[in-house]
């Protein structure tokens, strides 16, 4: 994947504005509420039976931060995303048996959360750049499945 200097700068500028724990929690909360079947992979999280339970669940917050920390690694290693996610792809495929479609759903939720955080700053160009970033991450996470 080729990244222009403008794309790199756009990713970094947006990233600097994010509170990772908040964005991660909100994206995962949105995933679980909008696509409730995705919760089946998170039985160890306890109560995910309602919007309120999901939004206040500390394990959702914890895992959301874990997701965002991995995304941080990707942002700081844009030219090596495929390698960066190799082991995680193996784990999600061989051990966790996660449907790779869920990665796409989470990326959609992340874009929506970015929109709520950035408002008018999420211009079409900014969105396109972040959609590109997340599609590269999703492809890397889904790699073991092919």
Swiss-Prot record:
**Coiled coil feature spans:** none
Q: Keyword set for this entry?
A: Heme, Iron, Metal-binding, Oxygen transport, Transport
Q: Name one GO biological process term.
A: hydrogen peroxide catabolic process
Q: Name the positions where heme b binds.
A: 63, 92
Expressing tissues: Red blood cells.
Q: Which Pfam families match?
A: Globin (PF00042)
An annotated GO cellular component of this protein is:
haptoglobin-hemoglobin complex
Q: Which residues form the Globin domain?
A: 2-146
Top-level taxon in the UniProt lineage: Eukaryota
GO terms for MF:
haptoglobin binding; heme binding; metal ion binding; organic acid binding; oxygen binding; oxygen carrier activity; peroxidase activity
InterPro entries per UniProt: Globin, Globin-like_sf, Globin/Proto, Hemoglobin_b, Hemoglobin_oxygen_transport
Query: What job does this protein perform?
Result: Involved in oxygen transport from the lung to the various peripheral tissues.
The record's subunit annotation is:
Heterotetramer of two alpha chains and two beta chains (an easy dimerization is also reported).
Write out the similarity annotation.
Answer: Belongs to the globin family.
What is the protein name for this chain? Hemoglobin subunit beta
Q: What is the lineage of its organism?
A: Eukaryota, Metazoa, Chordata, Craniata, Vertebrata
